[in-house]
Amino acid sequence: MVSSIFRHRTIFVLAAMLCSIISSARPSARASVAVVTDSITYSHASSAIEEYISSMRLDGKRGILLIDRWGVPDSLRAALKNLYEHESLEGAVLLGDIPVPMIRDAQHLSSAFKMNQQRDWKSSSVPSDRFYDDFNLEFRFLKRDADKPELFYYSLSEDSPQRIRSAIYTSRIKPADKAHKYELIDSFLRKAVKAKKDAAVINHVLFFAGHGYNSESMVARMAEYKALHEQFPTIETNGGKVDFINHDFDESVKDRLLAGLSEPSVDLAILHHHGYNDMQLLNGSPYVSSPDGWLSLARNYFRVKMRSSRNPDKLKADFINRYGIPAQWLEEASDPKFIAQDSLYSRSMDIYPEDVDAHSIAARFIIFDACFNGAFIEDDYIVSHYLFSDKNSTLAALAHSVNSLQDVWCDEMVGLFSEGVCAGNIYKNIWNLETHIFGDPTFHYSSLSSWDAAAGRGEYSDKFWRKAIASKEVHPDVKALAIRKLARRGSITPEELIDIQSNSSSEIVRLAAFDGNAEIAPDCFDKAILLALDDDYELLQRLGAKFASYNQSPTLAEKAVQLFLDPLTSKRVLFHIKSLFVTIDGEKAKSLVRSTPYWKGEDGKESLCRYIDSNTSSKKVDIDNLSSESIDLRSAKLFIRAQRNQCRADALDPIAEYYTRCSDPDIKLLIAETLGWYRYSYLAPHAQSLCQSLLEKESDPRLRAELTKSIRRISE
């Protein structure tokens, strides 16, 4: 172990020394971008790499070549940090076979990833380049993967900050096609250089909404359409437009969407849908209005179920008895004709890599608001097919290496593209653990402006950013950036943010102010939530409802009931309000229901009161189980784990009390980690106090570490 540690430290120093040797001697005040590549990739594509590095000067930046000769993440991180400290490093392009940090014990830094870490390490870790771009985060090396040696596992330390604050941006240029990867890298870099010479303005934005996304709320779609016009205010005056495609425009919308993405005028695409690493999931079962259509869908459903069953004979008998359907329908499952028919039908619902390869995608930047589309550790990932095709104009993309949350501000600061800011300097201020830029992070529309440097660097003063917020001429996304910068410095108060949220005429700025308070999570967060719940911007109201379900302050109860009973509450807002509604004290909830107008009338109210009674009873069973002498451990673990999403106020003390009596270290570890999720709760100070009390009495190093981490998560 000692020799291993010594060897890693030696590599650390060598990498730092190498940076000073290969760095350009130009003035360090000029922003630099490191192109990090392995020696084999460099030997195959050196001409294109050098040309790409040289092209940085077209943006007024310096390119720096850094060849990874060791293949160890710690060495590269040290080298990048050295460049940041001494060479004004702005970002890094990870080109070719660069080692992949696989992060564990940091699920709170992701938007949605909450997998049990006892499962396979490849599946239960997050591939994340935050290891390379956030120098404040501290990690412990765990091991190198035996099957995929490019994967290195790290645990986020309890001594580390528990929030992402990237100092630089990073991107991956990594073709999925291993047989032709060097040719593809060469071709892509030449495409990127050409684009720098021919930069064009952004005139045409296309966004898409897939099946099952955001509860298929059309209010959410309309609100996004309106918001994009605010984020790109000159787009129509310049002869451009914002277009929208919904999944239900066609039974199979794939061809329409691919054709839209291939329109030569499309500059930027925002794609909201579900996904896998090699699939973009677009359509579900179509809406049909004829008996023939219903029967066709039903027969397809039964055939698919039969084929996936482990006991088809039993399932066949069950279907016949339950639905009274002909046996012939079920026998079709093994008919080659129907197997081929169903396969083609299923294939028509979604986008696969070969579909992308068959088109000429025009969008130069694409946001993949989907799970796993950027899973670059897999043998194939669909983002690669958009980037590495001579026919495609795509130069950069934003995507996720694991699953991602639906209800986030996906279009956050995207309007900075129209203000002359490059992709990297936009998204380094936004991303989560799983978020990655793929392709050229220095990509931008039109020419870069002074806002690019302001977005990328930290030396701009509070006065500078406050002036931006106060200006009537400044773009709303620049104001959003200013709010983010000030909030992360602790240079703007919660009360100031509430004032902005109350008085700004811009829905983008109001949302940015609310988001700033969500980062701070102050005692007055419930006031910001109440303002959000009354806002006419659907996304702000929706995020207000989401955070309300975490906060659960009694001051939110009346508004929650009003929205829950209001026939005009939009579908996705209602989804989150229901999560808050079920946490309200049963008697109080019934009283509020009975005193609030409800479009379903008195019968509807009584039905709702019965639901409240049932829910109250169910909650009592779960909480009573924690104090029972004959505790159901399986139910207890499920209940505790559920609080990572629910953060129920009435569960906080019972969970902490159970920790003191529990003898199972794995359950205690789960509790210690769960308490940290109460960061947005109105009981957050109490949760922190409970963690501190448990820590003072705990001797197990692993549990002490997790409690320490939870204290940091709540307090930072």
Segments (PLM) and residue ranges:
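Structural detector for internal amphipathic alpha-helices that build alpha-solenoid repeat scaffolds
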Residues: 477-489, 508-520, 541-553, 572-584, ...
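Catalytic-core segments of thiol-dependent peptidases
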Residues: 84-103, 209-379
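Short inter-helical turns and helix N-cap capping residues of alpha-solenoid HEAT/ARM repeat scaffolds
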Residues: 474-475, 505-506, 536-538, 568-570, ...
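Catalytic cores of nucleophile-dependent amide-cleaving enzymes
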Residues: 124-188, 296-409
